[in-house]
A protein has these predicted regions:
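Coiled-coil-like amphipathic alpha-helices with heptad-repeat character
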Residues: 7, 76, 219, 225-228
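TRAFAC-class small GTPase G-domain
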Residues: 1-212, 240-242
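Extreme C-terminal disordered tails of eukaryotic proteins encode short linear targeting/docking signals used
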Residues: 225-242
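Generic N-terminal initiation segments characterized by hydrophobic and/or small/turn-forming residues
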Residues: 23-26, 94, 219, 225, ...
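Intrinsically disordered, low-complexity regulatory segments enriched in Ser/Pro/Gln/Gly
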Residues: 210-224
Length: 242
């Protein structure tokens, strides 16, 4: 019973985006409340853990370990990084507000996670450039959070104090924040950004509680969430159902 409780008291969130957008700095700020002084390129994957109080301030409050899996964005490792994708309970998509291409590439990151989760020969499936969230049945049930970094370098923010939401956030019905990872006030306790992030963590935990209470039916997590994709167990290939 104790082992089962420990397994239930943690969730895994993928933090993905192009190289150089500031994923490692963001994860460090989330987990430690401090700015990362010396950032370096992530090779493979780096994992940091934050203790999150689920449903804080309510009778249901309880601590959860939130594992943030910072996946390296280098194209040279794109054929191997799918090993980090199974299982997944939530996704944080990170883009550089000064680099529009990094925002556009978030669609490729989503399709990579959805199509490659679970490993095997699925890694040979080509990425989907024109990702459409509506075509993935049940995808909206997998919590997604979008973060735009380098807020301080955006002229729109300097003049109005706001940055318009990204199209990918709208398409996925995901919440979104913009941050300056060089300023710890970006995620200061009680701030709007911190509250939104906390709500996202709660959603991830609630989703994990729901999915772990179901039988898997022989399919991986994202195959269950996206019934249009079903893996042929004999050939390890995907077939479309329904």
């Amino acid at each position: 019973m104790a082992n089962h409780a420990n397994a239930m008291n943690k969730v895994k969130i993928l933090v993905v985006g192009d190289s150089g957008v500031g994923k490692s700095s963001l994860v460090h700020l989330i987990c430690h409340g401090q700015c990362l002084s010396n950032s370096s390129w992530t090779i493979g994957c780096s994992v940091e853990v934050r203790v999150h109080e689920y449903r804080e301030g309510t009778p249901s409050q309880r601590p959860y370990f939130v594992e943030l899996w910072d996946v390296g964005g280098s194209n040279s490792h794109k054929n191997a990084r799918h090993v980090f994708y199974n299982p997944v309970h939530g996704i944080i998509l990170v883009h550089d507000l000064t680099n529009r291409k990094s925002q556009q590439n978030l669609r490729r990151w989503l399709s990579e996670i959805l199509l490659r989760e679970g490993g095997g020969t699925k890694s040979r499936i080509p990425l989907v450039d024109d990702f459409d969230a509506e075509q993935f049945g049940g995808f909206s049930q997998l919590p997604v959070f979008v973060v735009g970094t380098k807020q301080e370098q955006v002229a729109e923010f300097r003049t109005s104090g706001r940055v318009r939401s990204s199209s990918i956030a709208d398409e996925c019905a995901a919440d979104e924040i913009t941050v300056n990872t060089l300023d710890q006030r970006s995620l200061a306790p009680g701030s709007s950004n911190a509250v939104r992030l906390s709500r996202f963590f709660d959603k991830v935990i609630e989703r994990q509680q729901t999915t772990t209470s179901r039988t898997d039916g022989g399919f991986s997590y994202l195959e269950r969430e996206n019934p249009m994709f079903r893996r042929n167990k004999a050939t390890s290939s995907f077939v479309v159902t329904g």
